[in-house]
């Protein structure tokens, strides 16, 4: 929604933490400078940077509620939508979970193209590209675990439980705190 977009203006969020920290190594990302400039432009104008949604991104947004219901059924849990969560009262760092689960968990849903979903099913693990997002969401939301779900309505879903990686989160926290300083 527009209100949700306004809350995110100028704030690094977990979905873009890979632009600050590299997924596989946990080292600073080469795209951090460009990302900082985008966020500064948002902060100065009060407007989010325009991002062109691909058809698959749009499809993912449209299918998220269906995927969340599937997750609830498959995992026999109740989930709660949360909106934007800030790391602390400074409101400089955030995450937007697809859902919070129980007292200690969260959920990240992806609804990719069929060939990508098949790859995720075969690999049966958190794709490396999403490590910063998932570990970052646990850091920001103060959760102990996060489920990564890949959903395609014509195939079985993939749900992978990911636990906190404290050394990775410590590196991430240092880089992101320096990024917003």
Model-based region annotation:
Residues 57-79:
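Acidic-basic catalytic patches of nuclease active cores, encompassing PD-(D/E)XK
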Residues 73-97, 101-180:
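Nucleic-acid nuclease catalytic cores
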Residues 26-27, 66-70, 146-149:
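Intrinsically disordered, low-complexity boundary segments flanking structured domains
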Residues 1-62:
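Charged, glycine-rich intrinsically disordered N-terminal tails and low-complexity linkers that flank
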């Amino acid at each position: 929604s527009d209100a949700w977009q306004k809350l995110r203006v100028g704030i690094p969020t977990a979905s873009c933490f890979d632009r600050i920290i590299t997924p596989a190594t946990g080292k600073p990302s080469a795209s951090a400078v460009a990302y900082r400039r985008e966020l500064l432009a948002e902060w100065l104008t009060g407007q989010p940077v325009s991002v062109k949604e691909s058809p698959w991104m749009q499809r993912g947004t449209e299918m998220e509620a269906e995927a969340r219901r599937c997750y609830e059924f498959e995992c026999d849990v109740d989930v709660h939508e949360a909106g934007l969560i800030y790391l602390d009262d400074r409101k400089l760092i955030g995450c937007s979970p697809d859902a919070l689960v129980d007292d200690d968990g969260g959920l990240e849903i992806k609804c990719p193209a069929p060939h990508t979903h098949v790859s995720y099913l075969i690999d049966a693990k958190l794709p490396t590209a999403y490590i910063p997002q998932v570990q970052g969401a646990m850091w920001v939301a103060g959760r102990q675990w996060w489920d990564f779900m890949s959903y395609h309505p014509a195939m079985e879903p993939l749900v992978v439980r990911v636990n906190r990686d404290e050394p990775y989160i410590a590196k991430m926290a240092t880089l992101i705190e320096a990024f917003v300083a």
